[in-house]
Amino acid sequence: MDQLHHTMPFEVTYRVMRVSRVTGMETGRFDGILDGGTISRNQDTSTVESADLEYHGDISEFGADLIRVWADLTWPDGTSESIPLGTFLPDGPQRSVNGPNSTTPVSCYGRLRELSDAHFAQPLSVPAGSNPVDVAASICRDVGLEVLPYEPCPYRTGSSMTLGMGSSDSESTKLGAVNSLLTMAGWVSARTDPMGRVSLKPYREPTEQATAWVFTEGDGARFCKEMTDERDWFDVPNQVICVYADKDHEYIGVAVDDSAGPYSTRSRGRVISRTERYSDIPKDKTRAELIAMANDKAAQLLVESRSVIHRLTFTHIYAPIGVGDVIEMHYPTGHVDGRFAIRTQTLHLTAGLSVDTEARYFERS
């Protein structure tokens, strides 16, 4: 879908296909899925994607295959397009029975669930000098997932490390290991594309990313005029206290924003503090140098703390964008204008294929 067709009316139908886990190929239509349902994407959850559908019948004997949801769109100019919306593991443990009829709510999980369900039978040793992204990709492939081509990663591990030890999910599951390796390299957590393939990408600030889609008020607008425009500014600190301490000594640094800025002590009329404590005190510095270091750290943290989450929640007609993508919103009537990175999406599998989107941007004063 391009920007031109996005402004045109369209008809949409949905189909759910059965996908062989062995070959990755679609083997036929999975009939019986009732109209409606949702697909959710959330970059703050480990498996990112999920879906809720309803099936006419019993899905308990579905087997190991996957399902893939498609939207088939047709425009008045005769153009048509089939858009994959997600590939999932279906689960329907509970069936509602009414005489000979029955329906099953189907909870669907993105394919990263296969990594989160898998633990290491033996700890995995990663030698010093390894490419952590290559190791992460190898772990994904070992559980049967396809990994899309990714950029070269220049980072190398400085020392050997062992994965798969510990009791928490981030330490024991293969998804936890993959995301730890990606974080080490400065990459975003693993995600999947609508075909169920794993996508590995380096992290880039929204200001460094190209705009994926533009929403503009006017005749071609395809977003609802009612939206939520929110800024979380109330708790932004205007004083930071930095404490370096061990059992014998304590060195305190303080930074205060008393400028004319919107979050300063002068503008707010009160002090809003944040305190950070550190125990790693350098041994080769004088008391004056340590106090100066604490003051410098407090000043650095004060600058970093002066950020406000500008959050935009709105509904729009489907566009080919996903979590992490940067969008522009130009809505003069509502006094909303800016660039935002998508955090969550909920796709409604109904007429119009509407999407509830939350996007945000960190504003620094």
Enumerate the predicted regions with their spans.
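Oligomerization/assembly interface segments of phage tail-like spikes and tubes
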Residues: 40-58, 102-114, 242, 276, ...
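Short intrinsically disordered coil segments
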Residues: 67-70, 121-127, 215-220, 257-259, ...
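Charged- and aromatic-enriched interaction segments used to assemble
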Residues: 100-231
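Acidic, small/polar-enriched beta strand-loop surface segments
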Residues: 1-24, 179, 183, 188, ...
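Beta-strand-rich assembly/attachment modules of structural machines
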Residues: 1-131
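Intrinsic-disorder/low-complexity loop/linker signature
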Residues: 23-24, 46, 77-79, 152, ...
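Hydrophobic beta-strand residues in large extracellular and virion-surface proteins
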Residues: 12-16, 51-53, 67-71, 90, ...
